[in-house]
Amino acid sequence: MKRLLIPALAALIGSSALAQSPKSNLRPDETVLLYCDALGETPDVVYAKKIIPAGFKMEVDNKVDRPESISQGGDLSDISKMARVDLYFPKKPNGQMVVVCPGGGYRYAASWREGLYVAEWMLERGITVAVLKYRIPNGNCTVPLEDVHNTFRYCRSNAEKWGVDQIGVIGFSAGGHLAASASTLWIDQVTRPDFSILVYPVITMEIGVTHKGTRERLIKESAVWNHHLADKYSLQKQVTRFTPKTFIALCSDDKVVPAENSLMYYNALIDNDVPVEMYIWPKGNHGWGFEAEKYVGKGNDPFAYARQEFEASLERWLKEVR
């Protein structure tokens, strides 16, 4: 695979100057482009100086030709051919690596609260991190999963060099659906996660239980084979005894993704004798990610009352699955 060290483009700098910046100075050590050869214009300010084209062939195009855009909170929209992976290497790696799938209803990637801030937390614990800025499906249901599979291929091929011997996945909301897809719809041992962490995930495509926008953007309501796709991407139906051990976290007052999604997946894991831990807190709603008060200010984290408990439980579990 070719390695290129390229300067920032003037156009890219210009667009970034208008963008908001995250409440963290952490930046990736490397940014890997899954399909294209160079990072073009983007308002995204979180990328590495070292850009590496991975050289994967794009099997399915999401047919999105709009430029990327970003919100004040770091929600990165319209990711297409510049699908990329931000790599973060800890000073003292413990052998674990986590592929991070931010949420966003398959419309955008919440690249700060469910990406960058996750990486910062993981790095402090010696975990190598790959934050995946995956393509939006735009009704092409295989697109995000193709990006995850290629991310695992790239990470597995470099694992020995990085001092990594275990690679898992974490996903939030629609990114949780993607992480659960990676955990149930893997192709081989290379693409199979060693463990899975799902935070307020979308699991089912069942109308009335799923998140409507996630379903529509993934499989489109007008698809000829819609009912077959709905079954395939209702991931509680895809769990087997080979599904990786799982950690699930959510709030019972979630008004965006019903808690029943997580319960369906939990029950399927239990039925298939897959080790699972699930934590349900009474309040916090949806989308709290790793956006703690140190990023948003005191009193602005709806999950502050339980965050320490969540982080301690996750840290313990990550040590136990080693």
Identify what each model region corresponds to.
Residues 255-264:
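Conserved alpha/beta-hydrolase "acid-adjacent" motif
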